């Protein structure tokens, strides 16, 4: 009986594993089909304008064969080798893109700039599955960790890569649709222009689905399409200015025209989706003003949509079309942004190989040298286009970088003020024992921006002095956004402890930048109360008091500190902090972004001198 039972259990486990594998394969195939439009839409429309974009004079058969050779090796080296085989493995818990690679580097080395976003030591680290920097660091890592200039340059590189990707999302709808309709053309690097998009869109799909779609469909289709165009142009050497449509047989010309136009419209989705992803990453890491982010899938947290970002892209795209007027200038701008994003990816990927993967320096050189030479050649080609429209992505990137820097500077100044004026536990006791101060029924979550263990911000003293009260059970809550994509549910509520006076506690809620935050749906209040009863509360009486406070009502209190810019404030602070206040006033409140009901929100305003 024992042996028979063992065999049956083994067969059940084996059958379950097979069903799981089948489900995984079928899901990957479905996702691979979806990537054909969302991720690779721009890449498959490149035959519309690659040949016509070239300034050829009396081309010969050798010229066309040479051009096709460059196309083939560009697709193979950048598309297959760089992105499919290497870059897709440099994901941060399923999230891709330049900012995700920067996050990955920050997890394995002390190279972050923001103190509030640092990777905690083994003693401070709360999340069980987060990598802790350990072992003997290499020379490169020691150099970057010890040099603030190198760390700032690395952050600037990641920010520029993200901003260039957003600039790509602005230019893509214009160049793709206009190319399908009237032959407006992009630059030569567009042969592989969507390779970066498939990396940034990794959070929307999966690594295996992207690899399946590219290798089984996209790559062979493009190789054959360009080969067919080249064969036609060898026999019709003067037709390169309209190489795609003249290559199409006349009976199917109009159906192909309609399909190409529709495909060009869909092609814009790849960079638009990538823009949503990188904006969401930067918002959660507090490098960008808060915008609304909607999760469009219950199964994949990486599938997001931002209405405000979408409208911003629409307005900028229309502005680009109206401002340029000439499609060639749009193409010039497009070429600059595409190749610079590729170059930044190459640099960050090299650092990932050396610092995280521990790849031998010889293998890294075999990767870096060929791709650096190839992409440097493309950079030299597009540099001539900067004055003829290529300045647009630089202008967009500088504007976005200015927004990010202004937001970061203001947030950092607030953090410094909180650290310098924090309310100690002794001071809290004095405030609560002051004349006329009462404890009122209910459970209060008092939010603190402190990330290093200090729960009590200056807003607390301002609140007690003016309201003359504090809830019977008050939990000082810190939201800790870690430089990881997702946090396991069991690691969500951490550092639960008592903070001196009766009924006053502290805890930390941990989230990664790809996590959806919804306090009501996730019942965070219930999780915190459960953690208090399990880890802190002594005796039934205190436990019942906590439950009674929750039943009496939950309120979420958040301080809203503003800068008071006076006449004696230095000019640099006056400009940057004024810019931050403008951004802060225009962006969304943090509490609605957490899914907290309107009737439970209280914001306490406080001014302090800059």
Region roles according to the model:
Residues 1-610:
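The structured alpha-helical core of multi-pass membrane proteins
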